[in-house]
Amino acid sequence: MPILSRKDLERISRRVLFRYLTLSDRKMDRIDPVDFAEKICGLHFAFADMSVTGSILGLTSYSDVDLTISVPRGNGSVQEFHLNGNIAYVDQNLANAGSVGRLNFTLVHEAAHQILGMLYPEEYNPSAQPFICRLADERCSYPITDWVEWQTNVLTAYLLLPRELIDRYMDELGLGRQIKLLNKVFAPKEYALFSEMAKRLGVSKTALSIRLDN
């Protein structure tokens, strides 16, 4: 598989977002994950109970794959997920819990897998890895042990939080070009504005804070 840097992934995001804007006829106040996934890669979503522990948030496959995954449940039943490259399953608890930020990140994350698979079909070989699970972690841990997930997480952040939208809301909320101290106790005013910014963008505060550092 290709080893892509943050700069590489940002350049990819710029091309993809430009394409998305040409397909949309409205002002962008935030990236709509469902609309984005459908327009860019024809991906649709279905909600399901992904795991008993909540450790798996999403499941999808690259294009040209047709398979069914059977997952044993605690009550002795078996749940089947049919994958064909056009559907991604998302953990139902994300919607039930009202966690909009984590839900949106997961939706774009699944689309980002498809985008990388389309750009690098030989490297992201479906026969070698026919399906992909998204684990419950928005952070990019170091040292990197899973380049597929690291690259997908970074691309997701660039797609969901383009620099233009960040700069726009930083200006509108009076945060300037940089938040020097992000702390709920020692900088409550800035933290409240930062929280409002995350709400407007439809992301978690964790995802936004990571994006602001990169």
Name these PLM-found stretches.
Residues 1-214:
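Active-site hotspot residues in diverse enzymes, especially metal/ion-binding acidic/histidine motifs
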